[in-house]
Swiss-Prot record:
GO terms for cellular component: mitochondrial inner membrane; respiratory chain complex IV. The keyword NAD does not apply. It comes from Taterillus emini (Emin's gerbil). This is Cytochrome c oxidase subunit 2. Pfam families: COX2, COX2_TM. The gene is MT-CO2.
Amino acid sequence: MAYPLQLGLQDASSPIMEELMNFHDHTLMIVFLISSLVLYLISLMLTTKLIHTSTMDAQEVETVWTILPAIILILIALPSLRILYMMDEINNPVLTVKTMGHQWYWSYEYTDFEDLSFDSYMIPTNELKPGELRQLEVDNRMVLPMELPIRMLISSEDVLHSWAVPSLGLKTDAIPGRLNQATVTSNRPGVFYGQCSEICGSNHSFMPIVLEMIPLKLFENWSLSLT
């Protein structure tokens, strides 16, 4: 989860988030090199006393500064497209969970079980226990098995919402009348926090998401206790 004064991304807990962090570093390095080159050229232009008044065109230079940016854009686009298609792939999910956005809470339905659904509301500040996080804790966490592909079906009952868990690389819009899907996979057990990431009304900031990833055996015991 995020912590105060954090500058970087949250620790990756899914293969998709690991790919996104690698792509971020890859792109940032290209931007840094281009910015350094531009600043260097600007400093040369400001400090040099040499001028050339007879040059009207330079075909070689124009060719270079046309081809080189195209190559750089390709180097950025190829890994970006690869990750984009990876995020859309859902191969043999072991579980499907439907989440619906409401003003201002989330509801979850485990479609592989006959009667396993619940609403998830934020716990008010005056009801928090010691050690719990303000505006991030909920009364009912969504529990899922770790290290397994899980399909999330995401929609909304009223206005636009967005279901987002940054450390898992997830952010999917919840749109009324439309069913979006995403893949959830976690490399390790833990509790992961997110929030609605689309302004949806006066209590938009009171729509936290808490996702608890546990081993498969514990998940089976949890599901049996609720059905």
